[in-house]
Design a protein with these regions (language model features):
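Short connector loops at helix/strand junctions that flank enzyme active sites
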Residues: 58-61, 87, 98
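DNA replication initiation on ssDNA origins
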Residues: 1-62, 169-172
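Hydrophobic, Leu/Ile/Phe/Ala-enriched alpha-helical segments that form helix-helix packing faces
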Residues: 26-36, 81-85, 121-129
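Short amphipathic alpha-helix segments
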Residues: 70-89
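DNA replication initiation modules
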Residues: 1, 50-72, 107-176
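Short beta-strand
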Residues: 91-97, 134-139
Length: 176
């Protein structure tokens, strides 16, 4: 299992930079979709799995990944999400395509199923005037491709962990 700090280090590091730059130059959606599935690492923010499907969920992580696609003004939406009145931000980064955002928030399911809680969160987001959330995230086993984003945001509570340098990877070596 990897944590928020591991993912942040990966995203802000150089590990996915070549494939992110290549993807953003692609013109067709089918080509880009194939490229993502074969060239990008991914994680499942919402849980730990034996195999990546809902029935193989070992433990929910207490996190939810909200995906905003085709965003007109990335910086404006980023600020609105960081200042959201109901949800805290654990991690926020630009999607592999470069035209969306991935927003990782903490959740307390309190016995709710992931997909029902996700829909409630999506409705709350919509009610506060933000763009529609991609509903594919309602699948607890949904993978999230990890791009290069040197400007990714991580919650300040992780400051000490982010600054701790427990290893010195060689160029191209994955941090986890």
């Amino acid at each position: 299992a990897v944590g928020i700090v591991d993912v942040y280090r990966y995203i802000t590091g150089h590990y996915a930079q070549p494939q992110t730059e290549a993807l953003r130059l692609m013109l067709t959606s089918p080509e880009a979709k194939r490229y993502k599935t074969t060239h990008f690492d991914y994680c499942t923010f919402s849980g730990l799995f034996g195999k990546r499907n809902e029935k193989e969920l070992i433990m929910h992580s207490g996190l939810m990944c909200l995906d905003f696609d085709h965003v007109e003004d990335i910086m404006e939406l980023k600020q609105k999400l960081l200042n959201h009145e109901y949800f805290d931000t654990e991690l926020l980064f630009v999607s592999p395509s470069g035209n969306g955002l991935k927003w990782i928030i903490p959740v307390d399911l309190k016995g709710w199923e992931h997909f029902r809680y996700f829909k409630a969160v999506a409705n709350c987001i919509k009610a506060t005037g933000l763009p529609l959330v991609d509903m594919s995230g309602s699948d607890v086993a949904r993978s999230c491709f990890l791009p290069h984003d040197p400007q990714a945001y991580i919650n300040p509570k992780y400051k000490d962990d982010v600054e701790e340098n427990i290893f010195r990877p060689r160029l191209g070596e994955c941090p986890f």
